[in-house]
Amino acid sequence: MELEGLKFLGIGLSVVGMLGAAIGVSNIFSMMLNGIARNPESEEKLKKYVYAGAALTEAMGLFSFVLALLLIFVA
């Protein structure tokens, strides 16, 4: 396999990182809604942790996207 083909294979595999971020964020928010439904008074406590966790999870997807762009345009 040529180097160009391996480059595009790596770009395609970077989708796995973005898929993981999407699944992670959906799990975080579904668990938040589940927790609020069980205990409505915990909403304010949960929100700060949920937003921090979602931001970190989404950052991994963005890093994967940036890596794919670097592979496309730089490598």
Curated annotation (Swiss-Prot):
Protein name as annotated: ATP synthase subunit c
Record-stated family: Belongs to the ATPase C chain family.
Membrane topology of the entry: Multi-pass membrane protein
Gene this protein is translated from: atpE
Keyword Cell inner membrane on entry: yes
Site positions for Reversibly protonated during proton transport: E58
GO cellular component, one term: plasma membrane
Compartment(s) where it occurs, according to its Swiss-Prot or TrEMBL record: Cell inner membrane
Described function: F(1)F(0) ATP synthase produces ATP from ADP in the presence of a proton or sodium gradient. F-type ATPases consist of two structural domains, F(1) containing the extramembraneous catalytic core and F(0) containing the membrane proton channel, linked together by a central stalk and a peripheral stalk. During catalysis, ATP synthesis in the catalytic domain of F(1) is coupled via a rotary mechanism of the central stalk subunits to proton translocation.
One Pfam family hit: ATP-synt_C
Molecular-function GO term, any one: lipid binding
